Regions:
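ACP-dependent fatty acid/polyketide chain-elongation machinery
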Residues: 1-88, 96, 100, 108, ...
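Conserved catalytic cysteine-centered active-site region
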Residues: 5-6, 69-80, 94, 153-226
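Conserved small-residue
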Residues: 11-15, 31, 103, 124, ...
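Active-site-proximal alpha-helical scaffold in enzymes
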Residues: 18, 97-115, 196, 211-237
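Acyl-CoA/ACP chain-elongation machinery
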Residues: 39-42, 190, 205-208, 228-237
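Flexible, glycine/charged-enriched surface loops at secondary-structure junctions
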Residues: 44, 114-120
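Extended hydrophobic secondary-structure segments that form protein cores and membrane-embedded regions
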Residues: 121-128
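Short glycine/threonine-rich loop-to-helix capping motif typified by GTGT followed
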Residues: 129-141, 222-225
């Protein structure tokens, strides 16, 4: 019995950002009412017309176009008085934003800041695989010269007048720059999976360990396991 008491882990606050639920209360209501939150892929995430084919043997396509999608969420760091400069926030993957939102909700649920906690002994341990989708968008912009180089080798493109070829490349580059994020010193920190936990720790000024566990589909369980082990060892509170 003593061992069971020693190993008990208290959940003192909860937060969530999930499909059809940008807070834990709404998520629980959705579960209670049996709400179904699986839907077709939104075009602004990835266009099924470009990437979907029902035949699983077709290369470079997916045979599924459904999933659980977080669509609209209220990201208001200035209103929440979070120390995130606008330019930094602009370069942040939505996964980092969701993590900060969930952490903020969990802290408020706990009673923070009226109910104190020891920031020096507060750890941030999250589970994530492959970060989010922001790095795909910046990669498309970065690698555009690779695509134009391959285009230059196509016989039908080579047969075009130089002015037409130049116009095609310049107009396409203009579209890429309009639709895909620019590259800055904030790009890489805004995309990396191992920055997610660090971002939460920095925003809320927590000084304990912070890291992101990546175990593919078991990332959440790996994070739980690591967090529980640290609590049991007294590494943090």
């Amino acid at each position: 019995m003593r061992d069971q008491v020693h190993r008990a882990i208290a959940i003192v606050g909860v937060g969530a950002v999930l499909p059809d639920a940008t807070d834990a209360k709404t998520f629980w209501e959705n579960i209670s009412t049996g709400r179904y939150s699986i839907s077709e892929t939104p075009v602004d995430r990835w266009d099924p017309a470009l990437y979907y084919d029902p035949d699983p043997k077709v290369p470079d396509k997916t045979y599924s176009k459904i999933g659980g999608w977080v669509r609209e969420f209220n990201w208001e760091p200035l209103k929440w008085r979070l120390p995130i400069p606008p330019k930094v926030a602009e370069a942040m993957d939505r996964t980092q934003k969701w993590s900060i939102m969930s952490a903020r909700e969990a802290l408020l649920d706990y009673g923070y800041p009226e109910r104190p906690l020891d920031a020096d002994r507060t750890a941030v341990i999250l589970g994530n695989a492959m970060a989010g989708d922001q790095h795909y968008k910046t990669a498309l912009r970065i690698f555009f010269p690779e695509f134009t180089r391959e285009l230059d080798t196509a016989p039908s493109f080579q047969a075009l007048p130089e002015a037409v070829k130049r116009a095609i490349v310049e107009e396409t580059m203009g579209q890429v720059r309009e639709h895909f994020p620019s590259i800055s010193e904030d790009t890489m920190p805004g995309e990396l999976a191992n920055i997610i936990a660090g971002r939460v720790a920095a925003v809320f000024n927590f000084h304990g360990p912070n890291f992101t566990a990546d175990a593919a589909c078991a990332s959440a369980m790996a994070a739980f396991s690591a967090a529980i082990s640290g609590l049991e060892e007294g590494d943090y509170d």
